[in-house]
Amino acid sequence: MSNAILHSSQYQNYRRIDLIVIHCSATRATQRYTVDDCRRDHRARGFADIGYHYYITRDGVVHAGRPLYQVGAHATGYNAHSIGICYEGGLDIRGRPCDTRTPEQKETLHKLLQRLKEDYQEARVVGYRDLPGVQKDCPCYDV
């Protein structure tokens, strides 16, 4: 795990956060998709930077994305009051939605959520698919 978790509260009071939204990268279990790949793809779509605040790779390392004081670009209509976390994966080898989180990713996500809930006690943790109006399978498991 990187230092991204240690600095999670650095700017906590700048935005009201009532949601922590879990996403997957929608990449196959056999495909490597790094935080740099995600950042590049988001910039190619016109985003200023990676849309998520945290990105967890298959090895369980959490990478800092946007600073928490910046509004993310991960859940239209919810970005202003949410934190976005994405894990690498979410599709099986055939490209179907599947919980592909590794044990390391599960452990890291659990620790990250514990840390964030210390600062944002009222925030609900939801999967992207659980938000009203979203018609996707992401994050491909029941949050």
Residue ranges and their predicted role:
Residues M1-V21, S25, R58-V62, P67, ...:
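Basic/polar, cationic surfaces and motifs that engage anionic cell-wall
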Residues Q70-V71:
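A short acidic/small-residue loop/turn micro-motif
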Residues A44-R45, H74-T76:
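Short Gly/Pro-enriched turn/cap motifs at secondary-structure boundaries
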Residues A29-D37, D41, R66:
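N-terminal carbohydrate-binding/catalytic regions of secreted carbohydrate-active enzymes
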Residues R39, R43-G46, K117:
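N-terminal cationic-hydrophobic initiation segments that often serve targeting/anchoring roles
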Residues F47-A48, E122:
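Short, well-ordered coil loops that connect the C-terminus of an alpha-helix to the N-terminus
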